[in-house]
């Protein structure tokens, strides 16, 4: 029964692995997909946030946890595990062009590395030990609006039985699993500029490919589904995370096709990303992360010049506007 529960947990965690520009592109390179509709309805607001510009090596660090309490309660297994605590390290690794929907599209490649573990020894059907989950996520995100084109997640789940402490030398590898989700068109988690009261909906195709190896977990079959998701900017204010510059963040809440809430992001313009996120995953998992550190790459000065008359005779006096940021 313990192995069965751990297997189910591994599969559930696997499902967890479900934002006019001016660029100084020192690193730039080229790497296919169809057209669908997104529906936007806008309302009045008191503040807005435009699409941020990321740089290679921009980094966000989060503390967080996976709340597995509801899943455990429904599993029928005797255990005292409630959450797996950990951290998430998110970095912009690259910027390049790739083919999306028949068009050359500028994208970010973003890597997230998460490490989670039980709070000391737990019990699963009478066996004590520590449960660990390591995750690596590679996301391809469209530069123009931070829409997600794909996510590839590698999940490593293992259990250390208790023997004078949690014994790594007795470690049981539950499995290493890989899941890749591709969204066509890319999933618009934000509709910039963000403003309170705005809502939008997308119909899209989601292709999911599975691979990996495990002695306990059956690797799921690949799938392709039609889905619909909607979002709403429900408020602007304090997310509850005391991070400097983020006291006027935007709460963007997501809903499934039945109108059920599936999670939310608190978008903070000052950190060019989320200060807090809460997402309900398959099997009742809840993933919660809060920002603890934002390390942007130093932005260089950008000079733009506009002239009164782009075409004019030589040797005449015209006006020009110079902007330095």
PLM-predicted stretches and their roles:
Residues 318-324:
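Aromatic/hydrophobic beta-strand junction motif of beta-rich domains
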Residues 9, 20-22:
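Cleavable N-terminal signal peptides
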Residues 2, 20, 66-67, 142:
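Poly-acidic low-complexity segments
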Residues 14-18:
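Hydrophobic core
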Residues 23-136, 145, 172-315:
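Acidic, serine/threonine-rich low-complexity disordered tracts
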Residues 133, 137-172:
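Low-complexity, serine/threonine/proline-enriched polar segments
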């Amino acid at each position: 029964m313990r192995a069965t529960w751990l297997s189910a947990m591994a599969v559930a965690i696997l499902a967890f692995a479900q934002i006019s520009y001016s660029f100084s592109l020192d690193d730039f390179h080229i790497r296919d997909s169809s057209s669908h509709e997104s529906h936007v309805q806008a309302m009045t607001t008191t503040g807005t946030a435009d699409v941020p510009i990321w740089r290679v090596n921009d980094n966000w660090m989060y503390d967080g946890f996976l709340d597995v309490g509801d899943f455990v309660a429904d599993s029928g297994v005797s255990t005292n595990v409630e959450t797996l605590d950990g951290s998430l390290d998110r970095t912009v690794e690259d910027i390049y062009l790739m083919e999306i929907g028949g068009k050359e599209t500028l994208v970010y490649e973003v890597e997230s590395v998460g490490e989670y573990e039980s709070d000391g020894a737990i019990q699963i059907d009478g066996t004590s030990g520590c449960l660990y989950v390591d995750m690596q996520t590679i996301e391809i995100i469209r530069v123009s609006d931070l829409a997600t084109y794909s996510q590839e997640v590698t999940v490593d789940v293992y259990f250390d039985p208790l023997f004078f402490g949690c014994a790594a030398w007795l470690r049981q590898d539950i499995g290493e699993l890989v899941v890749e989700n591709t969204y066509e068109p890319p999933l618009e988690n934000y509709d910039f500029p963000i403003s309170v009261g705005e809502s939008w909906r997308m119909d899209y195709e989601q292709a999911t490919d599975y691979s990996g190896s495990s002695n306990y977990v059956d690797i799921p079959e690949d799938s392709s589904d039609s889905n619909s998701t909607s979002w709403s900017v429900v408020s602007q204010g304090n997310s509850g995370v005391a991070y400097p510059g983020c006291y006027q963040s935007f709460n963007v809440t997501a809903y499934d096709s039945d109108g059920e809430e599936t999670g939310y992001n608190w978008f903070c313009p000052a950190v060019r990303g989320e200060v807090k996120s809460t997402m309900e995953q398959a099997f009742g998992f809840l993933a919660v992360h809060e920002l603890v550190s934002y390390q942007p790459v130093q932005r260089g000065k950008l000079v733009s010049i506009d002239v009164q008359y782009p075409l004019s005779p030589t040797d005449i006096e015209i006006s020009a506007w110079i902007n330095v940021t």
